[in-house]
Amino acid sequence: HGYDVVIHVAAIVHRKSITNDEIYTKVNALLPVAVAEKAKKSGVKHFVFLSTMAVYGQGKKLSGNVIDINSKPFPLSPYGKSKYAAEQKLSILSTDHFIVSIIRAPNVYGKGCKGGYITGYANIVKKMPVIPSVYEDIKQSVLYVDNLAELCRLIILNQDGGIFLPQDDKTVSAVELMNAISKNLGMNKSKSRLLGWLIKLLSFTSYVNKGYGGISYSMEASRYVHGNYVVVEFDKAIEETLR
């Protein structure tokens, strides 16, 4: 008694130093279930679990890759598998008196956020004389940390259970992302189709796919019926992140 909700965010994400899948299972699958069971036994009414887009087992593609409300989970990585294992067990714990909310977040960014998603693109922008203009129609989903926090608030306020697929107000291409970073770093670098053509020649490499490939949620799948959780739009979010 005394706690209305537990929000579980602890996890081990992709770490090259970890070669034992058992660690992913212990931290990402067994721990959240144990916490949820303890919460339920103690009379807590609501459990919010931060999961991941990785449960779909779909990576970035240079042809684009859109996940919608009909897409089925099929995790491939130890991270995705362990998170999905937790989801399945948590769903069993859900009752009319114990709400379980699962948030399958895409790349989360913001000032101080670990993972280096924006930092990686910022480093490219700083090193390149211009921004390679290519694959501008290939989009990816991202989620600003303040928007994630607002979604959590709304889910708790409305006592909503189920699965949620959040993202910012729009999906963005790598070029859009680098343009926004360049602008907020005071660089305002121009785009180069010539350099983009050279990048396209290297499309067979994993580096190009990682940088320019897309994986996104459909906007329909990301809608929340009880309010707008996007309290900071993408351009402002990048500005706040790089400030």
Please give the residue ranges for each predicted region.
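Glycine-rich Rossmann NAD(P)(H)-binding loop
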Residues: 110, 132-139, 164-172, 182-185, ...
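Catalytic helix-loop patch of NAD(P)-dependent Rossmann-fold dehydrogenases
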Residues: 26, 61-109, 113
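Mid/C-terminal beta-alpha module of Rossmann-like enzyme folds, strongest
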Residues: 151-208, 234-243
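NAD(P)H-binding glycine-rich loop region in Rossmannoid oxidoreductase-like domains
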Residues: 1-30, 34, 38, 56-58
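Conserved Rossmann-fold NAD(P)-dependent oxidoreductase catalytic core, especially the SDR/UDP-sugar
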Residues: 33-78
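NAD(P)-dependent short-chain dehydrogenase/reductase
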Residues: 93-102, 106-141, 145-147
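Short alpha-helix in the Rossmann-fold core of NAD(P)-dependent oxidoreductases
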Residues: 25-32, 48, 82-83, 141
